[in-house]
From Swiss-Prot:
The keyword NAD does not apply. It comes from Xenopus laevis (African clawed frog). This is Probable arginine--tRNA ligase, mitochondrial. GO terms for cellular component: mitochondrial membrane; mitochondrion. InterPro entries: aa-tRNA-synth_I_CS, Arg-tRNA-ligase, Arg-tRNA-synth_N_sf, ArgRS_core, DALR_anticod-bd, Rossmann-like_a/b/a_fold, tRNAsynth_Ia_anticodon-bd.
Amino acid sequence: MAWHFRRVIAEQVSRVLGLPSESCSRVAQCIQTVPVHRKHESPDFQLFMTSLSEGGPNGTFSNQEERAEQLAGKLVCDSVISDIGTTRGSVTFKINRDLLTRNVLQQISKDGSLYGLNTELFSELSRRKTIVEYSSPNIAKKFHVGHLRSTIIGNFIANLKQAVGNEVVRINYLGDWGLQFGLLGAGFSSFGSKEKLLANPLQHLFEVYVKVNTAAEKDNGIKLSAQEFLRRLEGGDPHALSLWMHFRDISIQEYAKIYKRLGAHFDDYSGESFYKEKSQEVLKQLESKGLLLKTDKGTVIDLSEEGNLSSYSTVMRSDGTSLYITRDMAAAVDRMERYNFDEMIYVTDKSQKNHFQQLFKILKIMGKDQADRCQHVPFGLVQGMKTRRGEVVFLEDVLDEARSRMLQNMAASETSKQLDDPSDTAEKIGIAALIVQDFKGQLVSDYHFDWDQALQSTGDTGVFLQYTHARLHSLQALRCPRDTEDFEIASLREPCVIATLQHLLRYDEVIYKCLEDLQPRYLVTYLLSLGHLANVAHRTLQVKGSSSEAAHARLLFFKNVQMVLGNGMKLLGITPVNNM
């Protein structure tokens, strides 16, 4: 909604400055929002004179102040703009407070879950077909903490793209092929147990993998057996394929339990195995174009600009078996043909940056136009994530720990309510804590995880967001708001209400910024600020004991704040709780 008011201001500024009508959009982009204050009113928008200068800032500070005074003197207040002022070389604008209140509350009530997504800001965005590949664990291995980041980041990006109207395909590209599976397949006959596999599938397969890796370091024969098992797999050996399929099926069944806890889902479970044959077709295409070179270590493709192999990628081992990048090439080509996507986003840790740079370059060399539509979203490492028992290895341990700690905190709290399912509520709050802690900074940055900090109910945490949402929801039990077209604006003129409405006005711009950068931190910061503003308003505004008209207006206000807070939390992948 903020863009609408920017445009109204920009139209008047453009007229006064004698600018052509096509300049209005550029002027609107120069108009900035003013930081919201919780306890006193501030203007809504600000236009710095330097931003209107062609080629950037010019002139002295006093010149800019004088220009601001001159421009402000020519502008007039109207039904939209109630006050025009100047400060530090800029012109400030205050929106008519009654108009702001009525427009924001009515728009939220009308749009519901779509609030902020139907504004002018998004009107010119084309609806696209988006593929998001994320999570992508290696089968027969338990989730580790890195999979938490890939899963929740990918889920957020997919949610965001879907929210703005894109057709989104969520792909879980399983690591279900390659030499590591050769090791597991060869090692299961020596270290595996059908009984243990049935009792705790992923834990037992992990134990087998550790044992066979340790043994392979001392016995080269085991490495050779692993290579032989992989060759048998790629050759279609029935016994090897049967064992592989069994491990794959039970892995997906176990992963589904984790995804359910995280609120993640996928449209397509594919994997490297799907492309073992297609990868050979891709290699033939490259060979027919004279792009492959054979070396002692395998077959490579030259990626250097000079053609001197200063940069290259190995696409086939010397024994003829395929590599991870070969299967990724085949997967990308297949998706281009199958989905005809507008963009494909890969979400992995930053250590794979070079891999994706090579992949996209190879696709370009192959003449695939959609290579330019591929993007890698890298993320950093989580450090210091431990349970009470010690260093965490598996994601399941982290989720259990979050639930356990929240149950303890809820039991110790004097304000906790009687809940139908305390464990489920604790799980949702704990996962909110993990997501907010993860999303606060730049995704590519490493960060140190702190349980005590993440689970605070009063700081900038997921627990605080859940607490605020539940608190706002509890107000609705007092009285049901009536028709949103008719409410007493005079009961909503306190500075804390205006500050909250100013913040709600800017929701669409925050979503747009997230869409530009694919970074959730903007939305996290916005929601935390909204939570603090809502709590100030909750302490200030009286509902009980006020007149029917005042109570109705204030309950409508709180209901709409709760709706936007909940909408934003859902975009992040958080399930809001109504009681805690």
